[in-house]
């Protein structure tokens, strides 16, 4: 479950990066693409507003591949703590494609969330298809996200997700962004809404994201979302420091 904080913070420059990468690869169709990496430390790991690590600090690592014609993929890992089911870490694999639709970026992604050491690893892990549309209006980038899982974690049944994101590039190093999303899970005690707002500052290969995240889930219902301890759904500030290696090879 990739942390959304940094993704939101850099949303305003993402389309420009995609366009530049596509142009570079168009000049060399034989290229196998490029590999990059990220390493982060976050004060909490939140996925769609819910803490995945019992509101404790967590390291996060990722390796990304950017290929020809908008194709991309990668792996991502982070420390987790769900309480009773206690997986100690999460390892995700994803693959997708960006397509330019007259200035609007269409991103279709297949995403697999894996929890290898969970007590019920086979049913904890699950798959999601994610579709995003992003468009830049000068310094403002708007993104709409939709996702579906045919079988949510721990046999939660069919799940749907929708979200809207706005990111404003104040200058070349500071972005202010916010996100509102809604999650439906068939066998969860209720559907819920989450939101966050914050800012991302970039300096060379480093970035700092400061963000407030919260949900409308009451404490008594929080543990019903399986991937959470009872206090994981309450709001809080999250700080993330990220280091990006632009090109491994």
Give the ranges of each region predicted by the language model:
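Short glycine/proline- and aromatic-enriched beta-strand/turn motifs that initiate or cap beta-hairpins
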Residues: 27-81, 95
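Transmembrane beta-strands of outer-membrane beta-barrel pores
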Residues: 41-47, 77-81, 99, 112-116, ...
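Outer-membrane beta-barrel "beta-signal"
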Residues: 197-207, 212, 231-249
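Repeated loop/turn-to-beta-strand initiation elements of outer-membrane beta-barrel proteins
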Residues: 35, 69-75, 102-108, 138-144, ...
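Residues that define the transmembrane beta-barrel architecture of outer-membrane proteins
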Residues: 33, 55-59, 87-91, 104, ...
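Detector for outer-membrane/organellar transmembrane beta-barrel domains
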Residues: 122-187, 212
């Amino acid at each position: 479950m990739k942390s959304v904080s940094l993704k939101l913070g850099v949303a305003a420059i993402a389309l420009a990066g995609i366009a530049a990468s596509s142009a570079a690869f168009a000049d060399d169709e034989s290229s196998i693409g490029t590999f990059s990496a990220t390493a982060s430390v976050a004060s909490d790991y939140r996925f769609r507003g819910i803490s995945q690590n019992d509101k404790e600090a967590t390291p996060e690592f990722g390796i990304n591949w950017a290929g020809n014609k908008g194709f991309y993929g990668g792996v991502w890992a982070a420390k987790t703590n769900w309480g009773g089911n206690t997986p100690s870490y999460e390892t995700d694999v994803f693959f997708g494609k960006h397509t330019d639709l007259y200035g609007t970026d269409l991103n279709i992604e297949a995403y697999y969330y894996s929890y290898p050491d969970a007590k019920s690893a086979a049913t904890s892990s699950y798959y999601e298809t994610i579709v995003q549309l992003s468009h830049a209006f000068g310094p403002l980038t708007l993104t709409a996200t939709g996702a579906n899982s045919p079988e949510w974690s721990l046999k939660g049944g069919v799940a749907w997700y929708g979200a809207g994101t706005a990111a404003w590039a104040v200058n070349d190093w500071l972005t202010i962004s916010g996100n509102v999303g809604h999650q439906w899970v068939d066998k969860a005690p209720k559907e819920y809404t989450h939101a966050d707002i914050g800012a991302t500052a970039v300096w060379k290969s480093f970035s700092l994201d400061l963000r407030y995240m919260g949900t409308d889930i009451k404490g008594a219902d929080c543990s019903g979302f399986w991937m959470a301890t009872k206090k994981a759904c309450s709001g809080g500030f999250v700080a993330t420091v990220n280091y990006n290696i632009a090109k491994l090879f």
